[in-house]
């Protein structure tokens, strides 16, 4: 399954179950910069357990409407590697979970080799290494991260903030702090999740100017949204 096909299936699978639980406010600004990526997560232990570490291996999607910088998508493969996101707490009510994380880093790499591969049962000789070769464009740290997930539907929404601390592109950013991470996740079989991976991820990262602020709904509102 190609990445665009997988992404279309993910968006369909998420459906209303991942309705904006943490909603970026709309903006009329024409200067919104963001990058869009898709991939898969894998875990160091059981899901939804405090102490389990989440790792995400992802690639930039081929369509980037308003990228942060001019991308060489024909010549390079852009990969995103999220590591060390550690589950700090799990708030569960029936099939609904709010999972908060501590720590976590994110790196964006550009590699002309275009060799990134979601080899089954990570970590292995291809993951994370083929997502970390090439030059490091951005290196950041998470200041917060939350996953809202329904075990009944197998879908959810993630929301977080990142500060960019390094990488060759950081110096050219107007504001490297407070970038919003927002998107959907799913464990549906039709998404082609490789063996040994947990969820399909389809997030975006937005510059700090937009969307702002991020509206976090109450736990009651989260449950009501899933039940509709």
Give the positions of each predicted feature.
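Bacterial N-terminal signal peptides
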Residues: 13-22
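Extracytosolic secretory-pathway proteins
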Residues: 29-216
């Amino acid at each position: 399954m190609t990445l665009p096909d997988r992404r279309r299936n993910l968006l369909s699978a998420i459906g209303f179950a991942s309705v904006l639980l943490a909603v970026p406010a709309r903006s009329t600004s024409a200067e919104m910069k963001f990058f869009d990526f898709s991939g898969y997560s894998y875990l160091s232990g059981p899901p939804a357990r405090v102490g389990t570490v989440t790792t995400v291996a992802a690639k930039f999607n081929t369509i980037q409407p308003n990228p942060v910088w001019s991308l060489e998508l024909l010549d390079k493969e852009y990969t995103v590697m999220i590591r060390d996101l550690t589950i700090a707490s799990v708030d569960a009510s029936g099939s609904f979970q709010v999972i908060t994380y501590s720590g976590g880093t994110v790196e964006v790499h550009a590699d002309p080799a275009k060799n990134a591969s979601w080899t089954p049962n990570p970590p292995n000789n291809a993951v994370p290494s083929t997502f970390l070769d090439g030059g490091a464009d951005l290196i950041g740290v998470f200041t917060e991260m939350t996953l809202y997930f329904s075990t009944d539907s197998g879908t959810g929404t993630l929301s977080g903030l990142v500060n960019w601390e390094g990488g060759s592109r950081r110096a050219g950013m107007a504001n490297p702090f407070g970038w919003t991470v927002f998107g959907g996740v799913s464990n549906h079989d039709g998404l082609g999740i490789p063996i040994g991976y947990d969820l399909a991820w389809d997030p975006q990262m937005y510059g700090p100017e937009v969307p702002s602020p991020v509206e976090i709904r109450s736990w009651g509102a989260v449950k009501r949204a899933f039940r509709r």
